[in-house]
UniProtKB/Swiss-Prot annotation:
GO MF: large ribosomal subunit rRNA binding; structural constituent of ribosome
Record-linked PANTHER family: 60S RIBOSOMAL PROTEIN L12, LARGE RIBOSOMAL SUBUNIT PROTEIN UL11M
SMART domains reported in the protein's UniProt record: RL11
PTM info: One or more lysine residues are methylated.
Function: Forms part of the ribosomal stalk which helps the ribosome interact with GTP-bound translation factors.
Protein name: Large ribosomal subunit protein uL11
Pfam families to which the protein is assigned, alphabetical: Ribosomal_L11, Ribosomal_L11_N
Organism encoding this protein: Acinetobacter baylyi (strain ATCC 33305 / BD413 / ADP1)
The encoding gene: rplK
Subunit structure: Part of the ribosomal stalk of the 50S ribosomal subunit. Interacts with L10 and the large rRNA to form the base of the stalk. L10 forms an elongated spine to which L12 dimers bind in a sequential fashion forming a multimeric L10(L12)X complex.
Similarity-based family: Belongs to the universal ribosomal protein uL11 family.
Length: 142
C-alpha cells in the first residue's frame, strides 16, 4: 500500500551546505521530519555540484514522518549572473545594461536547465533564457 502524503516543503538550499539551521530546520521540524537525515542525504546528492550553488528542492513528507526529495536545476537568474560575471542584475533593465552574453553561453545555460524548461527544442529554450537575461539588464547576442 502506498504511503499517505502529509505535505510538501519547497526550499532553496545551497549545494553541499545543508544544515539544521534556518530555514531548513524549522521547515522540516514542524512536519516532524528527521532534519539531520535530510541534511546528510541532500549533501550526499549535491556532492558533485558546485558548493554553495542554490538548488531548489521539493520535499515530500509522508504520514509516517519519512520523506523523499526532488532536486530541480539552479535558478536561471543565478546561472545568468555567473555566466555574465556580475553580482546583481540592473535596477533599470531597459536603460542600464550590466553585462553581455553570447549565444553559446545561453545554449549552455539552456541545456543545464533543460529538465525544468518547457521549450520544444534548444532554440525555444535559448529564447526563454534570453528573455530572463534581458529582464535582468543583460545584453543578448542571438
Amino acid at each position: 500500500m502506498a504511503k499517505k502524503i502529509d505535505g510538501y516543503i519547497k526550499l532553496q538550499v545551497p549545494a553541499g551546505k545543508a544544515n539544521p539551521s534556518p530555514p531548513i530546520g524549522p521547515a522540516l521540524g514542524q512536519r516532524g521530519v528527521n532534519i539531520m537525515a535530510f541534511c546528510k542525504e541532500f549533501n550526499a546528492a549535491t556532492q558533485k555540484l558546485e558548493v554553495g550553488l542554490p538548488i531548489p528542492v521539493v520535499i515530500t513528507v509522508y504520514n509516517d514522518k519519512s520523506f523523499t526529495f526532488i532536486m530541480k536545476t539552479p535558478p536561471a537568474s543565478i546561472l545568468l549572473k555567473k555566466a555574465a560575471g556580475i553580482q546583481k542584475g540592473s535596477s533599470v533593465p531597459n536603460k542600464t545594461k550590466v553585462g553581455k552574453l553570447t549565444r553559446a553561453q545561453l545554449e549552455e545555460i539552456a541545456t543545464t536547465k533543460e529538465p525544468d524548461l518547457t521549450g520544444a527544442d534548444l532554440d525555444a529554450r535559448v529564447r526563454t533564457i534570453a528573455g530572463s537575461a534581458r529582464s535582468m539588464g543583460l545584453e543578448v547576442e542571438l
